Regions:
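Glycan-processing catalytic domains of CAZymes
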Residues: 1-366
């Protein structure tokens, strides 16, 4: 990515951060190393095929790709376009527009904007729609109620939200679709009750961020400074997808994995639009170094136990056939199902077993 070369140095990728991560306390699992040191390149179709193969093998229904559009300028669009150009990569997918400014916050604790998220005019909305349309019309694209599923990360940041989404719906119907099924990610905010909440069919409880918003203050015993060294479509679909705490320069914050999951499982759907979330792990040390947020006590066995409970929760309380998972390959934030050197395929096996024990495994492939 030319912009990454300019902003972070020649040859920079997310793997650069992952490789350079260092533990901040005894027993801290850093750096995270992909199994067989598979630091793949997502501009290589072989990597996409590998991801799709293992995802399907272990029961993942599909992927949700982050999409970056800045008034016609795109970043990191190649993997999604490569997916489109290679129909043999046989995995359902949908798109989430990650509509935020890009800043240097995680690297330098700076609010300097690298590229500003703007929303353009009607002409830009039209261009954006027709870029997305080619994906919406792909046979692998995920549909709900006969409409392509499109997620918006931060709808409250879009000043012309109603005008834009209604225009896109109009264009969709003019181009052979029944419209667009809009979703948004509930993080530390809730757009459902906003005056544009009616535009959305679904709201995703993005975890673990949502549970922090739901319970803004973790009790002291559940939140503490880490001590540094020196001072599923028949059945459930698993679709694979910051803190506001004051931290000192050397004070990563640790959370208890078990407690976070217990809180997630205690959440009741606020309305019929709510879609439950799940998370495998979270540790953004590769990006934030000694200012990271870290979950402790993570194991494949615990993940399997809690995911199985969330599947039942989704089915019986939310009445939904999908869960959005953080994440497939967010290595820079410790959220990944992909195999690593510590657990091998442990997290993917946990997904498979959780689906099987709850009767939601569509095809047994192991």
């Amino acid at each position: 990515v030319p912009e990454n070369d300019k902003w972070w140095g020649k040859g920079f990728t997310e793997w650069t951060n992952v490789k350079s991560a260092k533990p901040v306390f005894k027993g801290h699992y850093q750096p995270r190393v992909p199994l067989n040191k598979n630091y793949y390149d997502l501009t290589d179709v072989k990597a996409l095929k590998w991801q799709a193969d293992i995802a399907q093998k272990y029961g993942i229904y599909g992927f949700c790709y982050y999409h970056y559009w800045f008034d016609g300028h795109m970043l990191m669009e190649k993997p999604m376009e490569l997916m489109l150009a290679n129909p043999e990569v046989d995995l359902p997918f949908c798109i989430c527009w990650a509509n935020e400014n890009w800043t240097k916050a995680w690297a330098q604790h700076s609010k300097k904007i690298l590229i500003s998220q703007t929303y353009g005019d009607r002409e830009d909305w039209k261009n954006h729609f027709f870029y997305l349309l080619q994906f919406f019309k792909d046979k692998r694209y995920i549909y709900e109620n006969g409409k392509p599923l499109f997620v918006i990360y931060r709808p409250e940041l879009i000043p012309t939200l109603r005008e834009m989404l209604e225009y896109w719906n109009k264009l969709a119907m003019e181009n052979g679709l029944k419209g667009i099924s809009y979703m948004y990610q509930q993080h530390d905010y809730d757009h459902t009750k906003a005056d544009t909440g009616d535009l959305f069919d679904y709201s995703i409880e993005y975890q673990p961020g949502r549970v922090k918003g739901y319970y803004p203050k973790f009790p002291k015993k559940e939140q503490q400074k880490c001590h540094p060294f020196i001072t599923i479509r028949i059945g459930l679909n698993l679709i694979v997808n910051k803190l506001h705490l004051k931290q000192t320069k050397l004070s990563s914050i640790c959370y208890d994995y078990d407690d976070a999951w217990k809180r997630i499982l205690s959440i009741k759907p606020q309305d019929e639009k709510a879609v439950p979330g799940a998370f495998v792990d979270w540790d953004n040390t590769p990006r934030y170094k000694s200012r990271a947020s870290i979950y402790q006590g993570v194991t494949p066995a615990k993940f399997e136990k809690y995911l199985a409970k969330q599947i039942i929760h989704a089915r019986e309380d939310y009445h939904k056939d999908m869960i959005f998972m953080f994440a497939w390959n967010e290595w820079g934030e410790g959220g990944y199902l992909e195999p690593d050197e510590k657990y091998g395929y442990g997290m993917l096996k946990a997904v498979y077993r959780a689906l099987k024990k709850t009767g939601e495994l569509e095809n047994e492939r192991l």
